Structure formats: structure tokens, C-alpha cells
């Protein structure tokens, strides 16, 4: 049985958040990036969070957001953790009085160990698939052999995960956590409760 943590990202509906919690997800993610088909506004996020049971971490995903925009969201949405998924510098990620993680889009030749040292203040590093011009949610997996055995930070593995491949991903990479969005959807931004349940079952059995 696996102790790997899990996050269901791109939540836009209360029923999907509750399905994730019921299936045993440790965290749910809200995308505050207007260009994403999974984007939510503060009203949606607040309404969903208000219905959550305890012990489900709420994560806000941001892509090159201004400090002003981010602070305005944090004033009204009770987020536990921030996820920076753009070209943010370490300085851009600090100063919000919230723990944070940094997403890196993995390409051959990238020095992931150096990147982890650069983002020293991050609680973890999320590794995602590199697709030019697309900051995340690609639905494509990357070459997991590019991940070093030790990175010095908890690894959150993302990119094209589903119930069909997450067991293999966990066995190969041995991440702290896995992050899924498209792999548990019936349409972009609309989750499928059965797929969430199957994904969580595969994680626990890995």
C-alpha cells in the first residue's frame, strides 16, 4: 500500500471537490489563470471551499500573477498552499505568508537539482510536462527517467497521469505526491467521480 499523497487539480464544481474528498484525495487545486479552461473566480473557489470536509488541503495555482492580483485573491479565498506554475522567480513566490510549491516543466538536459536549490523556500517541487506555450494541464506525460533519484525536496509528480499509469509512475519516480487533472475528467474542468475513485485506488495500491 502506498503512502503517496494526492492532489486533484482544476476543480471547478462543488460536486467534484466532494468526490475528490470522498475518494481520499489529500488536496484539491484551484486554477486562478484566466487562459485555462479550468479557471475559477474567487466566488466559485470560496463556495467550493465552504463545502469541504476538514483535512483537505486547498491549493491555489497561479501563472505569472501580479503581487496585487494574488494578494486580492488571498484576502477572500482561504487557500492553504500556493502553487506557482509560470516563470516566477524565487522572490516572486515569497511574501504571501503561505507555504508554496514551484512547478517545473521538465525537458531533457534540465538541471533539476540546481532548480531545487534555486527555489530553496519551496515546500516541494512539482514536475510537469514541457509543452511550448502551455504552462500546465497538457494531458501528456514526460520521460520519468529524467527525474534524479534525490532532489532534496519533496517531489510532486504531474503530467498526463491517470489510473492506468500512476502505479508505474510511483514505482519509477517514488514521488512524495502525485497531481492529476485531465486524467480524471469527462471534459476540461468537469471531473468524473468514477475516474477520481479509480485514480485514488491505483495510488493507494501502488
UniProtKB/Swiss-Prot annotation:
GO terms for molecular function: phosphoribosylanthranilate isomerase activity. The keyword Amino-acid biosynthesis applies. Its EC number is 5.3.1.24. GO terms for biological process: L-tryptophan biosynthetic process. InterPro entries: Aldolase_TIM, PRAI_dom, RibuloseP-bd_barrel, TrpF_fam. It catalyses: N-(5-phospho-beta-D-ribosyl)anthranilate = 1-(2-carboxyphenylamino)-1-deoxy-D-ribulose 5-phosphate. Disulfide bonds: none annotated. It is an enzyme of class 5 (isomerase). Pathway: Amino-acid biosynthesis; L-tryptophan biosynthesis; L-tryptophan from chorismate: step 3/5. Keywords: Amino-acid biosynthesis, Aromatic amino acid biosynthesis, Isomerase, Tryptophan biosynthesis. Pfam families: PRAI. HAMAP family: PRAI (MF_00135). Belongs to the TrpF family. This is N-(5'-phosphoribosyl)anthranilate isomerase. It comes from Pseudomonas putida (strain ATCC 47054 / DSM 6125 / CFBP 8728 / NCIMB 11950 / KT2440). The gene is trpF.
